Amino acid sequence: MTVRDPGAWTVDELRPDDHDAWAVLHRGYLDFYESTRPDQVTAVVWQWLMDPTQELECLVARPAPGAPPVGLAHHRPFVRPLHGSVACFLDDLYVAPQARGTGAVDALLAALQTRCRDRGWEPVRWVTRESNARARAVYDRLAHRTDLVTYDLPVGPPAP
């Protein structure tokens, strides 16, 4: 796959008939992050994406209209009390290895940027591993790195 022009891609909403191709992409993403339960996670995320009451959405990149997706962007709104506004959190961004370097990521991010502009969500925010050099090179070209530090506070299992 040698497409390099982001405008040559079709980026649209994930559809129910995309399940199998999406699942391959999602498992690739989970493998990259060394998930220990990929099948269970993939099933839950698919249910969220197909449930209109959930906020999580997915844009996919296709090399041509109607073709199976080769990239995904899971995203959702989040409120910003400090600013009194709504922004977009990009939870997952993944492109199949054979489609990397072809403009698919640029196309996904451009489509997400347009969607967020249309909805009044500002900015689009995401995190990545410090060691993810290839992705960070793209992100550094398209976005601004913040000085925010991310923390996770474990909460443990639910009380009986």
Briefly describe each language-model feature range.
Residues 19, 23-48:
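Conserved GNAT-fold acetyl-CoA-binding loop/helix
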Residues 68, 78-90, 100, 146-147:
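A conserved beta-turn-beta hairpin within the catalytic core of GNAT-like acetyltransferases
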Residues 106, 130-149, 153:
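Conserved active-site alpha-helix within GNAT-family acetyltransferase domains
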Residues 99-111:
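Conserved acetyl-CoA pyrophosphate-binding loop and the N-cap/start of the following alpha-helix
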Residues 117-127:
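Conserved GNAT acetyl-CoA-binding A-motif
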Residues 60, 68-77:
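Conserved beta-strand in the GNAT
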Residues 48-60, 89:
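A short helix-loop-beta-strand connector motif used in the catalytic cores of GNAT acetyltransferases and
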Residues 1-17, 159-160:
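Conserved N-terminal entry element of GNAT/NAT acetyltransferase domains
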